[in-house]
Amino acid sequence: MTVKAGINGFGRIGRIVLRASLLNPEVEVVAINDPFIDLEYMVYMFKYDSTHGRFKGTVEAKDGKLVVNGKPISVYAERDPCCIPGRIGAEYIVESTGVFTTKEKAGAHLTGGAKKVIISAPSADAPMFVVGVNLESYSSDMQVISNASCTTNCLAPLAKVIDDEFGIVEGLMTTVHATTATQKTVDGPSGKDWRAGRGAGANIIPASTGAAKAVGKVIPHLNGKLTGMAFRVPNPDVSVVDLTVRLEKSASYEDIKAAIKKASEGSLKGILGYTEDEVVSTDFIGDSHSSIFDAKAGISLNPNFVKLISWYDNEYGYSTRVVDLLVHIAKVDGRL
């Protein structure tokens, strides 16, 4: 039995979500909508990827459909989600345009016949979920939900382990974040955020992020205890979180490592990784974990004040969690 899904927006996340879905036998993508990419271009963009490499399966255009590994996927080019035909057969929609991020806007998919919508971005008003952290809060009456951000997906599992074991009094997060599609290749206008308009390939760019504060939405008692910022760097993929926290309970760095390793092998297996290798960013391209703790990179100032480092493939890891969230809610809804 599979859950039939649709993808709205065939950009970076939309395409990687499709790749990730092909590895999950419980998900079948049956429709893709993107008004800016025609069918032949979809074939090309899915087949070739500068970061994740050439798609190892088969992909072609046939009879007006995108055929991946022999399975046809209906293709549409509607600008308004409510205009996507109800006959597409997709009960669950991954909203990955980056445009429709509120319950009202993403909810337009429901008009077209969808049962549920997962926004692949933070949302101002939709309930946010992080796999491994707060899935138990989902209920079947929720129609539009958010998978939060890639950075929140990296930070929240790590913060959960530390808070559960030692208690977090307060903390600051910095994410050293890979370039994304919204940045400029060369200097250009960028509204009120002047720094964001500087060339992505030539600069380290300080930026705001709500990722740390969003942890308070998925772990409510941490609300107000964490905040953070970002540095956008000239790196095509893989980012890293630097979490500096003050602990309630004194702990050696060895104690902290042991707690994270235990979680990575137990309750958070497949979500939170653990490594003691001498790793760098490219070692995590294509890693499906939400967060990979770097045991050798962290430092402790004293038993109550520590800096923790965790890597994440901000494209592939995040997209894998979108698929996991889809499967989870489908099971709760009785669709799987």
Swiss-Prot record:
Binding site for NAD(+): R12, I13, D34, R79, N314
Pathway terms, separated by semicolons: Carbohydrate degradation; glycolysis; pyruvate from D-glyceraldehyde 3-phosphate: step 1/5
InterPro entries the record matches: GlycerAld/Erythrose_P_DH, GlycerAld_3-P_DH_AS, GlycerAld_3-P_DH_cat, GlycerAld_3-P_DH_NAD(P)-bd, Glyceraldehyde-3-P_DH_1, NAD(P)-bd_dom_sf
Site annotation Activates thiol group during catalysis: residues: H177
UniProt binding sites for D-glyceraldehyde 3-phosphate: S149, C150, T151, T180, T209, G210, R232
UniProt EC number: 1.2.1.12
CDD domains on file: GAPDH_I_C, GAPDH_I_N
GO molecular function, one term: NAD binding
Annotated active site: C150 (nucleophile)
GO term, biological process aspect, one: glucose metabolic process
Organism domain of life: Eukaryota
Enzyme kind, highest EC tier: oxidoreductase
Gene Ontology cellular component terms for the protein in this record: cytosol
Catalytic activity, reaction form: D-glyceraldehyde 3-phosphate + phosphate + NAD(+) = (2R)-3-phospho-glyceroyl phosphate + NADH + H(+)
Localization: Cytoplasm
Sorted UniProt keywords: Cytoplasm, Glycolysis, NAD, Oxidoreductase
Subunit structure: Homotetramer.
UniProt similarity note: Belongs to the glyceraldehyde-3-phosphate dehydrogenase family.
Protein name stated in the entry: Glyceraldehyde-3-phosphate dehydrogenase
Source organism of the structure: Rhizomucor miehei
Gene: GPD
